[in-house]
């Protein structure tokens, strides 16, 4: 089973992934986008720190996704895979600038049509997002602002709906343990865990 954990910046994905790794490290392959491969680490550095065009950014994300899918997802589709970000957020971020159908086709090409089978979206309200962003330095994506990130969050839901990928929406302002409990419930329901 291939599940994606999605959410905008500061939603708590990384925190949840670390908690899940501690519990399921022997049962789930944990990956992330961008930057899971050596190649992807270089791409991540460029995307988040260099001043590049939106089109260049899109193709770098696609290159990272293609590499991760080819080297880690495809050979392990018979296993449990949990990814921190996926094609869902890739399309959600890019559809602010590019046509949805074109993005779907580019991502189908990059992934050989392998999309997550289920998505968990951590959703933040505007006030919580504003507070969390005020507590950190911003990368190039976060510098686009509060309204941009809230739109991306809505886009993630739209992408799941349009691609007909089942998803669960979780309130990311809840406490870490409650969110973790809900995610583990999904894992036990959808993944074959020994």
Swiss-Prot record:
Q: Which reaction does it catalyse?
A: dTMP + ATP = dTDP + ADP
Q: Which SUPFAM superfamilies match?
A: P-loop containing nucleoside triphosphate hydrolases (SSF52540)
Tree of life domain: Bacteria
InterPro entries the record matches: P-loop_NTPase, Thymidylate_kin-like_dom, Thymidylate_kinase
Q: Which GO terms describe its biological process?
A: dTDP biosynthetic process; dTTP biosynthetic process; dUDP biosynthetic process
GO-annotated molecular function: ATP binding; dTMP kinase activity
* Enzyme kind, highest EC tier: transferase
Instruction: State if Transcription regulation is listed as a keyword.
Output: no
Swiss-Prot/TrEMBL keywords: ATP-binding, Kinase, Nucleotide biosynthesis, Nucleotide-binding, Transferase
Q: What is its EC number?
A: 2.7.4.9
Entry GO terms, CC:
cytosol
Matching entries from PROSITE patterns are given as: THYMIDYLATE_KINASE (PS01331)
Q: Which residues bind ATP?
A: 7-14
Q: Which parts of the chain are coiled coil?
A: none
ATP-binding is among the record's keywords? yes
The similarity annotation says:
Belongs to the thymidylate kinase family.
Function, as annotated, reads: Phosphorylation of dTMP to form dTDP in both de novo and salvage pathways of dTTP synthesis.
Q: What is this protein called?
A: Thymidylate kinase
Q: What organism is this sequence from?
A: Nautilia profundicola (strain ATCC BAA-1463 / DSM 18972 / AmH)
Read off the lineage from the record: Bacteria, Pseudomonadati, Campylobacterota, Epsilonproteobacteria, Nautiliales
Supply the gene name: tmk
């Amino acid at each position: 089973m291939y599940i994606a954990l999605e959410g905008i910046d500061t939603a708590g994905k990384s925190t949840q992934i670390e908690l899940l790794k501690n519990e399921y490290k022997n049962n789930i392959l944990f990956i992330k986008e961008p930057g899971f491969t050596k190649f992807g680490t270089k791409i991540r550095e460029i995307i988040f720190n260099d001043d590049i065009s939106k089109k260049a950014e899109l193709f770098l994300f696609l290159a990272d996704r293609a590499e991760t899918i080819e080297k880690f997802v495809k050979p392990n589709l018979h296993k449990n895979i949990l990814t921190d970000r996926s094609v869902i957020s890739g399309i959600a971020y890019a559809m602010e600038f590019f046509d949805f159908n074109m993005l779907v086709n580019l991502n189908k090409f990059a992934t050989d049509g392998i999309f997550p089978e289920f998505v968990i979206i951590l959703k933040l309200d505007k006030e919580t997002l504003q507070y969390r962003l005020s507590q950190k330095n911003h990368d190039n994506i976060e510098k686009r602002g509060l309204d941009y990130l809230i739109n991306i969050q809505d886009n993630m839901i739209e992408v799941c709906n349009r691609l007909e990928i089942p998803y669960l929406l979780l309130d990311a302002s809840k406490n870490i343990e409650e969110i973790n409990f809900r995610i583990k419930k999904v894992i036990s329901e959808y993944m074959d865990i020994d």
